[in-house]
Amino acid sequence: MEASKKKMKFPSAFSILFIILLIAIGLTWLIPSGSYSKLSYDTTEHHFIVKTHGIPDQSYPATEQTLNQLNIKIQLSNFTNGIIKKPIAIPDTYQRIEQHEKGITDMIHAMVDGTIEVADIMIFIFILGGMIGVINKTGAFNAGLMSLTKKTKGNEFSVVFAVCVLMLLGGTACGIEEEAVAFYPILVPVFLALGYDSIVCVGAIFLAASMGTAFSTINPFSVVIASNAAGIPFTEGMGFRTLGLILGGACVIAYMYWYCKKLRANPEFSYTYDDRQAFYDLYMKDIDPNATVEFTFRRKLILILFSGAFPLMVWGVMFGGWWFPQMATSFLAITIIIMFISGLPEKDVVNGFTHGASELVGVALIIGLARAVNIILEQGMISDTILDYMTHLVDGMNGGVFIIGQLIVFIFLGLVVPSSSGLAVLAMPIMAPLADTVGIPRDIVVSAYNWGQYIMLFLAPTGLVLVTLQMLGIPFNKWLKFVMPIVGCQFVISSILLLAQVFMYAQ
């Protein structure tokens, strides 16, 4: 008999998603299948198309009168100018349909289909990894880190603070989510060189960006499209969303300061202390913190080009209509320029690119596997049933109870439909009119949608959490230990602000 038992390890990200896939299959047998009729705008024929399960598609003129007849309180211009591109659920059209049970074969198909659907994100991640591999070959990272650690000695938290603020602003303005993956390769070595751990890395980037996205002010992918789907200007409720951003941001920064201070005083305090060497080897194996590396003009130029790729990406998303193909193209172009000015042999830069890309294969596959869960739920036709049940759950409540109920409903729906824009066009045309029945403004429901679904963002394995943790080698249980205080903080802030809006409106 062994003197000591091996410590039980938490399942890997792949195993967690596989278990969730099996649960999703089980739900397609337990939850009745159902569907809302969906309205979409045909940009070619310039008319509305209504899709109802079991009957041929119906065509309607693209007019305000049609929208009024269907009880959709959305301006026609939001369809014609392309703001709303996804099908909108039509209120009061839910119907039960034949059961769409799924099995093991469907699950395997969903894994493949999910990977194909996120191919653009995967290519972006591979190019990002390749870029990092090339820059590591040049020695630019090593030289830059040595320079930074000397300049910030004694004031290391200033770097964490600056990153948190930038991520908060990026989240609230343009909803940085998948794009945040691009920041880890540049920032993780910085945090490690400053003496921090993997938790600080994910906290300053993912946690701060998610809090900013939760309290979105002008984010076109959540609060803007949700407001349009609710039939109101997105500026309504802006004041409370801004206040939430300030309070939520202060909560994240204060929490990060507490954790960093504890970590600096005692490295064994780290929530990921047992995994520290593997994480260090992953990101710092090509970097010697004690080496003297000359920070030449060429290396400075390479880091300037590398750093410039990120504000270019943010600008493209916000103002240029970019998505992952365009972002991948810009990163590849900058990588090619770096290859030419690196001064390295052709074989070295190519090997650096392929090696860097290969190290992110696991991360890319996790994204495809997470998408497979959503495919099973969609094909099982149970998402609309869950929404219909939730709608009846909060219908008829008084204002304060109603809005907290909405917050909880959207927390749950954030697990079922992890896409912010997808949840907005699915749920908002159904949920927003309920606000009229209890006598509160629709913008409060929009806030409940945004704050609720992003509480789940911190936890949902079907979202970006497992992608991030896979990239940094953090077990899911260690993440839960770290993030739960922030989840509680956001729930309290959201509840107080929602109740304050309801009571202020009632006066």
Predicted regions and their residues:
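Hydrophobic core segments of alpha-helical transmembrane domains in multi-pass membrane transport
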Residues: I16-L30, I125-G133, L166-G170, G212, ...
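Hydrophobic alpha-helical transmembrane segments of multi-pass integral membrane proteins
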Residues: F126, N155-I186, I367-A370, L377, ...
